[in-house]
Curated annotation (Swiss-Prot):
NCBIfam families: argB. This is Acetylglutamate kinase. Catalyzes the ATP-dependent phosphorylation of N-acetyl-L-glutamate. It is found in: Cytoplasm. It comes from Archaeoglobus fulgidus (strain ATCC 49558 / DSM 4304 / JCM 9628 / NBRC 100126 / VC-16). It catalyses: N-acetyl-L-glutamate + ATP = N-acetyl-L-glutamyl 5-phosphate + ADP. Its main location: cytoplasm. The record marks 25, 248 as: Transition state stabilizer. Gene3D superfamilies: Acetylglutamate kinase-like. One of its GO terms (molecular function) is ATP binding. Signal peptide: none annotated. GO terms for biological process: arginine biosynthetic process via ornithine; L-arginine biosynthetic process.
Length: 290
């Protein structure tokens, strides 16, 4: 009976979400744990079969760092963004497109999902430009050169719409090009937010390795289960948001301001976290609303 009650609880959410598009960002932590990846993909396949149109964007940070170290390259980050020289860019593209994307697509196929892997280059899905980062150093503002780190100039969502309309699950790696053919490494959180905005998605779901937005970043028990966009912006400006959570929060803020209805930041390592967040009243992570 308990299982039946859970299904009944999910019914209004399933009706509300039917035929809507959701962009789901899978973090690099899932790539190094086959059980987490398998469980995550099963959840997304279930979303597909109840009539939701999922779009998956993936990172691959841990695997990139591991491969870099094998080549004698030392990973370096600035505010959660990987500094990417030419050698690093070659490793990034090899790992994200050649290994991680293929692994996710294969996992979908094994679990009954019709997935298609693509990068931001394919069909000019994402046209990128070099990212210019400005930081305060004392009283001065300095420009930090991140190398081949890019940002989205614009998104052409047509190829994703074609795939969704024909029953496929797009799986996107955050490698993109500018119109001159230069290849860039884009932050996967940012790419997920930009694609969600271009599609006017119902939801943007960020899977990470922390419970969600924390009132105190050093205390996992301080989870904020529901927060307004204005409150999140205030936390960001006060420096409460730190490290790898910065690009996630920035992507969420931009997406909601661009028409995405809701965003969720949840712990993707917890079993069935997507289903619990979407189909139960309590949820499991943080929901951000306008």
């Amino acid at each position: 009976m308990e299982n039946v009650e859970l299904l009944i609880e999910a019914l209004p959410y399933i009706k509300d979400f039917h035929s809507t598009t959701m962009v789901i960002k899978i973090g690099g932590h899932a790539m190094v744990n086959d059980r987490i990846l398998e469980d995550t993909i099963k959840d997304i396949v279930l979303l597909y079969f109840v009539g939701i149109k999922p779009v998956v964007v993936h990172g691959g940070g841990p695997e990139i760092s591991e491969k870099m170290e094998k080549f004698g390259l030392k990973p370096k980050f600035v505010e959660g963004l990987r500094v990417t020289d030419k050698e690093t860019m070659e490793v990034v593209e090899m790992v994200l497109d050649g290994k991680v994307n293929s692994k996710i697509v294969t996992t979908f196929i094994r679990n009954g999902g019709k997935a298609v892997g693509l990068s931001g280059k394919d069909g000019l899905l994402i046209v990128a430009r070099k990212k210019e980062m400005r930081m305060k150093k004392g009283e001065e503002e300095v420009i930090i050169d991140l190398g081949f780190v890019g940002e989205t100039e614009f998104v052409n969502p047509e190829i994703i719409r074609i795939l969704l309309d024909n029953g496929f699950i797009p799986v996107v790696s955050p490698v993109a090009t500018d119109l001159a053919g230069n290849t860039y490494n884009l932050n996967a959180d940012v790419v997920a937010g930009d694609i969600a905005a271009a599609l006017k998605a119902k939801k943007l779901i960020m899977l990470t390795d922390v419970p969600g937005i924390l009132e105190n970043p050093d205390d996992k028990s301080t989870l904020i289960s529901r927060i307004r966009l204005s409150e999140l912006e205030n936390m960001r400006s006060k420096g409460v948001i730190r490290g790898g959570m910065i690009p996630k929060v920035d992507a969420v803020i931009k997406a909601l301001k661009s028409g995405v209805e809701r965003a969720h930041i949840i712990d993707g390592s917890r079993p069935h976290s997507i289903l619990i967040e979407l189909f139960t009243k309590e949820g499991i992570g943080t929901m951000v609303e306008p």
